[in-house]
Amino acid sequence: MKVQPSVKRICDKCQVVRRKGRVLVICSNPRHKQRQG
């Protein structure tokens, strides 16, 4: 899980999701997991 000031989609399977006020990127590739913070 990368914590970054701005999250971006890296590949086509990345999805930007809002959960509990946080912006997350979930993907089938675990290296692409990101959280805004």
UniProtKB/Swiss-Prot annotation:
Record has Ribosomal protein as a keyword: yes
Keyword set, alphabetical order: Ribonucleoprotein, Ribosomal protein
InterPro entries attached to this UniProt entry: Ribosomal_bL36, Ribosomal_bL36_sp
Disulfide bonds: none
GO biological process, one term: translation
NCBIfam families according to UniProt: rpmJ_bact (TIGR01022)
Family: Belongs to the bacterial ribosomal protein bL36 family.
Full protein name: Large ribosomal subunit protein bL36
Designated gene of the protein: rpmJ
